[in-house]
Design a protein with these regions (language model features):
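Cationic, low-complexity basic patches in intrinsically disordered or flexible, solvent-exposed regions
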Residues: 5
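Acidic, Ala/Val/Gly-enriched low-complexity intrinsically disordered segments
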Residues: 1-2, 13, 19, 27
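Glycine-biased, low-complexity coil/linker segments
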Residues: 8-9
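Conserved, single-site charged/polar hotspot
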Residues: 20-343
């Protein structure tokens, strides 16, 4: 979630004046501990490639293998970023821009540290997925502040993000020796969701956990109404004359999201309805109104993994970043990246 703005994607869109969210694709090419980032044309969805370092662990000369991999520092490694110009930046400089785009810097320091570890883990884990490309679409990858957006942040804000990265330098989350998929989102509405319920894949460390203290989140509750005609067009259904038949049976997940719901006699998954109707989350209720339906949602995002507002609530009550991460990613272990088994 961009600082003080409701959507990660719209953070860049509003800052740069584009109507749709600006999408940065992070092309990853290993080239002597660096990677090349190239800007694509605006005709290609106004997308910009951003390179993400894939750090190399040096094993030494033949016959002199070290007992353990060296510690990994984001400050010592670098990426090459091509926006309008070519630039060299340390991995932590790249992650600073991610952190500023993902979480309000007014959040507690321990929450910022937790987000820093999650973002670092996400970056190095996904460097080779999707042909080495990631993007800042909030439904897909991480936000990234370009030079103009970065300059809009006061020095104190940039320093708070940099401090969170320094104080967690090189730390990543692992599960059974492998880097995890460190997914995160804005707020859950009180409980996170299980990865199986959202993406159909059972991931032990992405299970449903309580996330108290999110009531103060400005995006925790939302309400949106749709006319009958709009719903019929969006879902390709016919609601009929009997309003009481518009909404049928529903099932719910452990995390409180809609697993499936009948509308107009057809059954839809909660994930599909969220996407088709642009809802903030799958945790919603439906009320029949005169001429249409009202959807009341809790939470913002896919609700799997780290809740950013939940992390801030935990930090405000004294939890350190290690405790926050172990709560939202149960069973995971913090390691320096050089110590993790799978890169």
């Amino acid at each position: 979630v961009a600082s003080q703005l409701p959507r990660r994607g719209s953070f860049l869109a509003l800052s740069l004046g584009f109507a749709p969210p600006l999408c940065y694709h992070k092309a990853i090419h290993l080239r002597k501990e660096k990677c090349t980032v190239e800007k694509l044309s605006q005709q290609m969805m106004q997308s910009v490639c951003v390179g993400v370092l894939a750090p190399l662990v040096v094993v030494g000369a033949v016959g002199k293998l070290p007992q353990r991999p060296p510690a990994f520092s984001g400050q010592d490694s670098s990426v090459t970023v091509h926006l309008t110009d070519r630039d060299d930046m340390a991995l932590d400089a790249y992650l600073q821009r991610v952190l500023l785009g993902e979480m309000p810097v007014s959040f507690e320091p321990e929450a910022l540290k937790a987000q820093a570890v999650a973002a670092r883990t996400y970056t190095v884990k996904h460097r080779e997925k999707h042909n080495g490309k990631l993007c800042t679409d909030s439904t897909c990858c991480q936000a990234f502040c370009d030079e103009g957006v970065l300059a809009a942040f006061p020095g104190e804000a940039r320093e708070r993000a940099a401090a969170a990265l320094r104080e967690t330098d090189g730390l990543v989350l692992t599960y059974e020796g492998a880097l995890i998929d460190a997914t995160f989102f804005s707020c859950s509405g009180g409980r996170t969701e299980d990865a199986l319920a959202v993406w159909g894949t059972d991931v032990p460390y992405l299970c449903s956990v309580a996330s108290p203290g999110e009531e103060a989140a400005q995006y925790d509750r939302d309400s949106v109404s749709f006319s009958r005609e709009a719903l019929e067009a969006a879902l390709d259904i016919s609601l009929g004359a009997d309003r009481e038949s518009w909404v049928g049976a529903a099932t719910f997940t452990e995390g409180g999201g809609v697993e499936a719901m009948e509308l107009g006699g057809q059954r839809f998954t909660g994930v599909y309805l969220r996407k088709a109707l642009g809802l903030r989350s799958t945790a919603f209720t439906v009320t029949v109104e005169e001429g249409g339906l009202r959807f009341d949602t809790r939470g913002y995002g896919h609700r799997v993994g780290l809740s950013q507002y939940g992390a801030n609530a935990m930090a405000s009550h004294g939890a350190d970043f290690q405790t926050i991460l172990s709560h939202y990613y149960p069973g995971t272990i913090l390691l320096n990246y050089g110590e993790s088994v799978e890169k």
